[in-house]
Amino acid sequence: MEVRFNPEAAEEVETARQWYAERSPPAAEAFLVELDLAVERVREAPHRWPRYGKGARQYILPRFPFSMIYRMKAELLEVVAVAHHRRKPGYWKSR
């Protein structure tokens, strides 16, 4: 299954990585590892994670206050947001 990050989601990943890197480079690396693990888990069983909004699903990163919001289109897994839990819920719906 192909995985594609929406440009805004990719920007959210980079912003979070930079924030962690400024405070703790190991935390920044751990964030990226956790996100890679999330992608692999979702790729293996995309329907396993709960629905979140219309047509989307949510994977909560266990060690960080972020959720990976994704949609499935045939053989494509589209990550539409990597949302911090303090952001307004559903801000990504127009993507």
Annotate the PLM regions.
Residues 67, 71-95:
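Enriched for short, Lys/Arg-rich terminal
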Residues 60-63:
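A short catalytic or substrate-binding loop motif that flags glycine-/basic-rich loops and adjacent residues
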Residues 2-58, 73-76, 92-95:
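Basic, Lys/Arg-enriched alpha-helical interface segments
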